[in-house]
Amino acid sequence: PLVITLGTMYLFGGSALLLSGMAGATGYEGIGGFPTAFTDFANISFLGIPMPLIFFLVCCLFFWLLMHRTHMGRNVFLIGQSARVAQYSAIPVNRTLYTVYAMTGCASAIAAVLLVSYFGSARSDLGASFLMPAITAVVLGGANIYGGSGSIMGSALAALLVGFLQQGLQMAGVPNQISSALSGALLIVVVVGRSVSLHRHQILEWYSR
């Protein structure tokens, strides 16, 4: 899945770049001229809550119910632990995976529409800077990189934490390159800490020799 994900990411990214007339490579304005109602949608508030935050909360609630209160979510966790065991348990592995990929694509599309509405222009590389912070937030929120466990609310809180951290760094005048490096360093620390926690007994036995 990782190789296919990386391959399709570059495939669709390059295709979007060509379809947009190389807007992300030769210019920085992107595709504009959208209706005012569309560009104002992501910049309005409802009861004092910004519209992107409302979508974020609704998506968190939906996926929390899906992953922790339905058979679909249980099947996803079981497949993450062992796809072969899940298949022997009469769980529709392929259908479940295709459904997960489809829902991930829909969630990405919603995020893309909100980004275009917020910035008022469309670029093929508009969300490229969110890739590493998103992975960091998911791992920091408790998801196992090897599959089989995770927390929607933990990932949501970690996403807010990473977002506030990056916003604070930008307000402090820290360059984007350093901010990205800090996100990568945080991801490495979290992964190493998780690995140490999972294999602490083996590590203690090795030190006690």
Language model: regions and residue ranges:
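Cytosolic-side transmembrane-helix boundaries in multi-pass membrane proteins
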Residues: 88-95, 169-209
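Transmembrane alpha-helical segments in multi-pass inner-membrane proteins
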Residues: 101, 108, 118-184
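Transmembrane helix-bundle core of multi-pass membrane transporters
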Residues: 1-70, 96-99, 119-127, 203-209
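Membrane-helix/interface signature in polytopic inner-membrane proteins
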Residues: 61-101
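Transmembrane alpha-helices
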Residues: 55-59, 87, 92-116, 128, ...
